Amino acid sequence: MVNLNPKRSDEPVWWGLFGAGGTWFAMLTPVTILVLGIMVPLGILDADAMSYERVSGFVTSFIGALFTIATLALPMWHAMHRLHHGMHDLKFHTGVVGKIACYATAFLVSALAIIFVFMI
């Protein structure tokens, strides 16, 4: 018999954020670390390109704000989803409390990223 009223799951939302965060972390974070953590300190890129005025101008632009928020928020959603399911795999059955704690942490970091970007 087919259940005509199946229970809706919220899991596709979390898996979507998990996938987006994993993709962002794998594709864009290494480039960001290369540029900001290696090329600028070694002098390969001009330090004036990373002056406060230029960075502030980038972060306060629409594309820069989206990039900064996504760089902070998406990997956090990925990490918290992985932590939530990792606890389950390790037999730490925290239930709804663990789910709320993990995703609330990711939401808090996302909200703080948005707030801090608009404070600049």
Swiss-Prot record:
GO cellular component: fumarate reductase complex; plasma membrane
Predominant location: membrane
GO MF annotation terms: succinate dehydrogenase activity
Keywords on record: Cell inner membrane, Cell membrane, Membrane, Transmembrane, Transmembrane helix
Domain of life according to the entry: Bacteria
GO biological process: fumarate metabolic process
Gene3D superfamilies, per database record: Fumarate reductase/succinate dehydrogenase, transmembrane subunit
Residue ranges of the TM segments: 25-45, 57-77, 100-120
The keyword Iron belongs to this UniProt entry's keyword annotation: no
Subcellular location(s) per record: Cell inner membrane
Membrane topology field: Multi-pass membrane protein
Stated family: Belongs to the FrdD family.
Main function: Anchors the catalytic components of the fumarate reductase complex to the cell membrane, binds quinones.
Assembly notes: Part of an enzyme complex containing four subunits: a flavoprotein (FrdA), an iron-sulfur protein (FrdB), and two hydrophobic anchor proteins (FrdC and FrdD).
Name the UniProt record assigns to this protein: Fumarate reductase subunit D
Organism: Photobacterium profundum (strain SS9)
